[in-house]
From Swiss-Prot:
Keywords: Acetylation, Cell membrane, Membrane, Phosphoprotein. Required for normal formation of eisosomes, large cytoplasmic protein assemblies that localize to specialized domains on plasma membrane and mark the site of endocytosis. This is Eisosome protein 1. The gene is EIS1. Residues 781-797 have a biased composition (Basic and acidic residues). Residues 752-764 have a biased composition (Low complexity). It is found in: Cytoplasmic granule; Cell membrane.
Length: 843
């Protein structure tokens, strides 16, 4: 620490003028008071951060190092200001105001009072009396009073100096250094001891806080051992991809094989042992320093908060449980076993036999070599700038040569300062020797106090042991009397227990006989109830069985009707193909007849044929047209019939599917009722749960029986209704046939109109012979039309009867069939068929 401390000028004058034992003590006390008074008027550190917080210690320390304002005994102008507490603010201001140039390290603002203070402190301050450490009661009290007024840096330095003294008292007696603040506090405490005739009783050292800090550290170390940090170790060639792990990883066995090839493994082991021991020593020093820093601001006599005490108690119990010997042995065994497993693990990779790894390593080494050759014999100046040594020497000679003169001046000042430091160290050594003598006297007094306290504790221990023994004997006698009373009570209870067991056995026998008789009666009653419930359930399930049989019969009839409809559809398809073939033949005949008419017209004009031959050819043309129209009408009727049958087949298929699903549903209902019957019989109930049946089926068993009776009535009335419908169909059929026979008479109105249209286009000449042929053709065509109408009507009646048997009717509108008819004489018969279908649907 610094020898040039924060003592003000007015205090330095007082210290320099004092001489002698008593006057020196009073002067140091006055300097202490002046320091207290000056610390009261300190201002708070300035705010330099944007968040409104002061600069941290680390930032101030770096700023001091950068600009040469750090407190060091190697410099005479250690602070540069009159007030040591304002040094950090001054350094920060200088760091902010100075420009970053070559001369930025120069001290721009040096207070001349600082040099005066340094010159006065050297020859005038000489310690003749011994100075004690901060272990006495008075020094501790003065430190606790001044604790809130001193800066954190002074407290930390004081704690550090104390720990260093306790750890290395015997080895470093001549190289210790303390600040003036701590020395003044110690002298103020020592003055009281000099004035008093008898040494006061030293207060016992409170190690509780030190132990708490050590326990916390031990707890953190145990936690790190139990839950180690998982770090990613990378081996092999380094790459620029810092985030990605290296693709090559070595096992412990492989690394041991590699390290076995090193020439000097023993030397490395020795170095490792030395390194580990040095680290342990550094850690122990660090822990001691941390403990000192933890307790430096806490007063031993203050009461601890209840919450803090409770937390400490919980931590102690936790550590006592965690750090038991059994837990530690188990943990050590587990760790050793895991380490053995890790050492024996093989990562299935080898270093020198892996060709891919060697190729990758060679490639990476070549790329690194190429990158290095670019900056060979160049120095990295930072920020991506590489300069050769020649350039650096040029720049240095141009920039540093003006500063060499100032450096020489500073060297001379440094030599003078070294001489002053040597003088001060000699004076300090004298004062430290006196301090050590006083410390020895304090230690001897402490030893005497310890012996007296030990003797007093022994006497108190003996008296307390005698009292405890007497109380224990009285307690034993009192407990013996209680045990005798309890033994007599126990014998009485045992006799009562035997009598009670006999009584309970007799009662159990009687109760067992009564329960056996009740069980037999209840079994007979249950069997009778089960038989009655089964009969009742069979009666309830009978309608379901009947309904299932009816549904299966209906399904069978629907399947037969579907087969008949499919056969009728195939027959009609064959007839449609035949009619199409005939129509194509008639079309060919018409084309041939047209060609023939053209030729005949040419011949008639050229040769002048007679009217009779021409009319015969025209009559042939009309007959062919009539036959074609008839075939087209038959084709349209059969196509309509085919469509109707296809619709009926689809309806029957859907009905058959619906009946199949209904049959499955009824079967499931039947199975459900049987299952409920079994459950009820197993439980011993008389009837089925009607509420559950209603939720599952939608009605109760009685409602289901009534509904099945109405369905059976409808099934019985269905055949009579079908017979009436069939009788009405036969009457309608006879009426349609009579109307068609009338329309197919000798006149033949539709065919004659077609003949007239044909004759008007060809010629206006007519004879008796062609008229007779036309009438004959009309008669034949009328008969064929009547036969076709009968077949169509028969097919219509079949479809209507099928619909009546299914209790459903399908309405066919005339508009849906008009586009299939050609408009010849067969149109009237088709319209009559449609009227018959509509009348049948109305009935």
């Amino acid at each position: 620490m610094s020898l040039i401390s924060a003592v003000e000028d007015r205090d330095i004058h007082n210290i320099g003028k004092t001489s002698g034992g008593g006057s020196r003590t009073s002067s140091i006390t006055s300097s202490k008071k002046s320091l207290k008074h000056g610390s009261k008027s300190l201002r708070k550190p300035k705010v330099y951060q944007t968040t409104g917080e002061p600069l941290s210690r680390e930032a101030l320390y770096k700023a001091k190092l950068k600009y040469g304002v750090y407190q060091s005994p190697a410099q005479s102008y250690s602070i540069g200001v009159s007030d040591a507490h304002a040094a950090s603010d001054k350094a920060a201001n200088l760091a902010h105001d100075n420009q970053t140039t070559v001369e930025a390290y120069k001290r721009m603002f040096i207070d001349p009072n600082a040099t005066k203070a340094a010159s006065k402190m050297g020859p005038k301050v000489v310690r003749n009396n011994s100075i004690t450490s901060a272990t006495s009661k008075t020094s501790k009290e003065s430190q606790t009073k001044r604790k809130s007024k001193e800066s954190p840096g002074a407290a930390a330095s004081k704690a550090y100096s104390m720990t260093m003294e306790t750890t290395s008292l015997s080895s470093q007696t001549n190289s210790r250094s303390y600040s003036i603040t701590s020395a003044s506090s110690v002298l103020s405490g020592a003055s009281g001891s000099f004035n008093s005739t008898v040494n006061p009783k030293p207060k016992t050292l409170n190690l509780e806080k030190v132990l708490v800090g050590a326990e916390k550290k031990a707890e953190s170390r145990i936690k790190e051992r139990w839950e180690p940090e998982k770090t990613n170790f990378q081996y092999g060639v380094k790459t620029d991809e810092h985030g990605n792990l290296n693709q090559f990883s070595f096992s412990n066995e492989m690394m041991n094989n590699i390290m076995a090839k090193v020439d000097a493994p023993k030397a490395q082991d020795l170095q490792k042992v030395k390194k580990v021991s040095a680290e342990k020593e550094a850690k122990s020093m660090k822990f001691a320093l941390g403990a000192a820093n933890a307790v430096k601001d806490m007063h031993p006599g203050e009461d601890i908060d209840k919450s803090i005490a409770l937390k400490a108690q919980k931590r102690e119990t936790y550590l006592s449980q965690l750090t038991s010997q059994q837990v530690l042995t188990l943990a050590r065994a587990n760790v050793d076993r895991q380490l053995d497993i890790i050492e024996k693990s093989d990562m299935h990779r080898k270093l020198f036999t892996n060709m891919e790894y060697n190729k990758a390593a060679v490639a990476v080494a070549q790329s690194n070599h190429q990158k290095k050759t670019e900056f060979h014999n160049k120095i990295n100046m930072g920020g991506g700038l590489f300069l050769s040594p020649e350039d650096i020497t040029k720049i240095a000679s141009g920039l540093i040569s003006p500063v060499l003169g100032e450096v020489s001046e500073r060297a001379e000042a440094q030599r003078a300062m070294d001489e002053e430091i040597a003088e001060r160290t000699e004076a300090y050594n004298k004062s430290s020797n006196e301090w050590e003598t006083m410390e020895r006297s304090i230690i001897s007094n402490d030893a005497k106090v310890l012996t007296t306290t030990a003797n007093r504790h022994q006497t108190e221990k003996k008296t307390s042991q005698e009292k405890i023994k007497a109380s224990f004997d009285a307690l034993v006698a009192r407990m013996d009397t209680k045990v005798a009373e309890r033994e007599t009570l126990l014998e009485d209870t045992k006799s009562k227990e035997i009598e009670f067991k006999k009584q309970m056995q007799q009662e159990l026998k009687d109760e067992k006989a009564r329960l056996d008789q009740d069980l037999e009666e209840w079994g007979k009653k249950c069997e009778q109830d089960i038989t009655e419930a089964r009969k009742e359930q069979e009666e309830l399930l009978k309608p379901y069985h009947d309904d299932l049989a009816n549904a299966e019969a209906e399904h069978k009839t629907l399947v037969e009707e579907r087969d008949e409809i499919n056969a009728e559809i195939s027959r009609l398809q064959d007839a449609i193909v035949d009619h199409k073939r005939k129509i194509s033949g008639y079309g060919n005949d018409l084309d041939a007849q047209k060609n023939r008419n053209i030729r005949e017209d040419d011949k008639l004009l050229e040769l002048g044929q007679t009217k009779e031959s021409l009319e015969s050819h025209l009559n042939d043309d009309v007959i062919i047209l009539a036959n074609k129209a008839k075939e087209q009408a038959e084709l349209s009727t059969k196509e309509a019939r085919l469509k109707q049958l296809e619709v009926d087949s689809l309806i029957n298929e859907r009905k058959s599917e619906l009946n199949a699903t209904e049959i499955e549903l009824k079967k499931e209902k039947l199975n459900l009722l049987e299952a409920m019957k079994d459950v009820a019989s197993a439980r011993g109930d008389d009837k089925i749960d009607e509420e559950k049946v209603k939720k599952l089926i939608g009605m109760t068993s009685e409602e289901y029986l009534t509904q099945n009776k109405s369905v059976e009535k409808n099934v019985e009335d269905l055949p009579t209704q079908l017979e009436k419908i069939e009788e009405g169909d036969e009457l309608k059929k006879e009426e349609i046939v009579g109307a068609e026979t009338k329309n197919s008479g000798g006149d033949g109105v539709p065919v004659s109109t077609a003949a007239k249209e044909a004759t008007e286009t060809s010629s206006a000449v007519q004879t008796k012979e062609p008229e007779e042929k036309i009438s004959i053709g009309n008669k034949s065509s009328g008969k064929e039309d009547a036969n076709d109408c009968k077949s169509a009507e028969h097919s219509k009646e079949i479809s209507v009867s099928q619909k009546a048997g299914n209790n459903k009717s399908l309405g066919v509108s005339p508009d849906s069939l008009e586009h299939t008819f050609s408009g010849f004489s067969q149109g009237s018969s088709i319209e009559d068929d449609q009227d018959a279908i509509s009348n049948q649907e109305k009935k």
